[in-house]
């Protein structure tokens, strides 16, 4: 007997359709969805062992980073199968399944239940933060401007400072026009996305389009074409088209840290393709696989990376992106009320 397990994009198809002009990567992910939307699999009972088997097979057939991360998923099956029995309660099953998913070392992998969410946060928790809300408030002051999800002001050395804390916070074309107009006479721009954990990829694309003057290759994407670990389509190029609105023509320093993940990681990939952009700070947190979701027999939902993306040089960015200048926040500067990373960016812009 067969059962269709629905695999769907984390973002709704209606939203993707509405924003299709900018959603370059999301559009291709939708194509992958159409190809693999129904996964035919042996029906598993709603028991702890049945849910374990269902989860293992979903990941086995659809996860996209097994080879890149050198993960032996069959060995992991043997390791965790002995921990599962049909007499365990839901909390015990949740713990085993979450532990198994943690072997993927992927911040895009989650197990959602009514009572808890399984997650993997080592991609940023094991590293220095290199960002301080207290210090940032010293630079923004109290009279900063707000445009959608952006906070911005002109620093005292005529450098524009813009902070974007989450790509889940909407930013409109009018917002971006206002920011660029306000900063147009500045020496340069500091664009701070530290601790931006991602969000809506269309916001990342919309913002990146304000920094390019021609159609720019920013990376590649693949989607799964079969159940094998290496069953992928050919890499398909991804481009950013220049905005038809105001575009920033001066130097930009992009600030990053380990908290930059998912859509923010992709945005960093885009910006590294722009000739006037320099990246300063720490290695990003990664998260380059576009996430899909699937359901277990008991109704729990698993999210996982299904479509790998690459930078313009065909490199994986799942484990993050190196800055052009690796700069850490120092205790000495912190005690002086200075942000080492912002100060390094100011020096670069003032010396150019």
Set out the residue ranges of the language-model regions.
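Bacterial Sec-dependent N-terminal signal peptides
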Residues: 1-45
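Alpha-helix termination/capping residues and helix-transition junctions
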Residues: 32, 183-185, 246
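Flexible, low-complexity junctional segments that flank or bridge functional domains
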Residues: 37-224, 229-237, 251, 293, ...
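C-terminal "post-core" interaction segments
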Residues: 39-53, 91, 158-159, 197-352
């Amino acid at each position: 007997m067969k059962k269709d397990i629905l695999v769907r994009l984390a973002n709704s198809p209606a939203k993707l359709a509405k924003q299709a002009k900018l959603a370059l990567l999301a559009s291709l992910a939708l194509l992958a969805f159409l190809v693999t939307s129904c996964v035919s699999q042996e029906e598993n009972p709603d028991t702890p062992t049945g849910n374990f088997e269902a989860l293992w097979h979903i990941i086995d057939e659809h996860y996209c980073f097994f080879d890149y991360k050198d993960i032996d998923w069959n060995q992991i099956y043997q390791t965790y199968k002995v921990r599962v029995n049909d007499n365990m309660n839901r909390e015990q099953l949740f713990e085993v399944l979450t532990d198994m998913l943690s072997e993927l070392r992927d911040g895009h992998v989650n197990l959602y239940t009514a009572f808890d969410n399984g997650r993997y946060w080592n991609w940023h928790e094991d590293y220095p933060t290199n960002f301080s809300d207290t210090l940032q408030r010293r630079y923004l002051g109290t009279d900063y401007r707000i445009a959608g999800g952006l906070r911005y002001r002109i620093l005292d050395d005529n450098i524009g400072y813009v902070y974007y804390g989450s790509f889940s916070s909407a930013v409109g074309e009018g917002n971006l026009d206002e920011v660029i107009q306000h900063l147009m006479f500045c020496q340069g721009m500091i664009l701070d996305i530290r601790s931006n954990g991602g969000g809506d990829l269309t916001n990342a694309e919309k913002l990146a389009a304000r920094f390019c003057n021609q159609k720019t290759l920013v990376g590649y994407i693949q989607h799964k074409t079969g159940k094998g670990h290496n069953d992928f389509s050919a890499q398909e190029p991804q481009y950013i088209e220049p905005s038809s609105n105001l575009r920033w023509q001066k130097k930009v320093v992009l600030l990053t840290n380990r908290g930059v993940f998912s859509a923010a990681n992709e945005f960093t990939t885009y910006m590294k393709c722009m000739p006037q952009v320099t990246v300063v700070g720490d290695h990003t947190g990664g998260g380059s696989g576009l996430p899909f979701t699937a359901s277990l027999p008991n109704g729990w939902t698993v999210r996982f990376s299904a479509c790998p993306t690459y930078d313009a040089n065909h490199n994986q960015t799942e484990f993050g992106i190196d800055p052009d200048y690796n700069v850490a926040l120092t205790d000495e500067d912190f005690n002086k009320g200075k942000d080492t990373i912002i100060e390094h960016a100011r020096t670069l812009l003032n010396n150019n």
